[in-house]
Amino acid sequence: MAKHVCPWWFGYLMASPLRRLTDDPAKILTPHVRAGMTVLEPGPGMGFFTLELGRLVGPSGRVVAVDVQPRMIEGLKRRAARAGLLDRVEARLAAPDSLGVGDLAGAVDFVLAYGVVHEVPAAGPFFIEVSQTLKPGASLLLAEPKSRVNVVEFEGELQAAGRAGLQVRGRLSMGRMRAALLQK
């Protein structure tokens, strides 16, 4: 699933601790993720949010991080190993046209789609595939950079999510990001 995918080497910059100044994973994720949850993270890069997700779900939870770039997945695995989170973080390589998460049908409690939907070839199929993984009542946090996704494009993503059975539960104020919380 790739339209204009972030280059693999940019993953190192996106995983920088300095990024916490604008995108604090704990602050963003803590209201939505609890111990024991199963979380799906499409487009995790090298795991900036994945590591915090792994800490939040705890030893009884699971994070499935899916990316189309092998080097991103390799970097994520290294970082998860260093953080001692490989027991709960699974990094998968996606196909160009599918996340490859059919085995998660109806099993996911929360999806983090942070800065990724604008990179997929079509939002509709992406949201359909993601929606199929969600349990009834489960949530998806959609966040897109204002510098890459204008208001009209973001609304188009929300409409595509709606057609996939996801309802907007609220808009979130996240600085440089356009964001909404959706629910199945």
Task: Please identify what each model-predicted range represents.
Residues 97-110:
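A short acidic, Gly/Pro-enriched loop at the edge of an enzyme's catalytic core
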Residues 109-121:
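A short SAM/SAH-binding and catalytic strip from SAM-dependent methyltransferases
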Residues 124-136:
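A short glycine-rich, Lys/Arg-flanked "PGG" loop and its adjoining helix->strand segment in the class I
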Residues 46, 52-99:
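Class I SAM-dependent methyltransferase SAM/SAH-binding core
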Residues 37-45:
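Conserved class I S-adenosyl-L-methionine
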Residues 137-144:
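Conserved beta-strand signature within the Rossmann-like core of class I S-adenosyl-L-methionine
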Residues 173-184:
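Core SAM-dependent methyltransferase catalytic element
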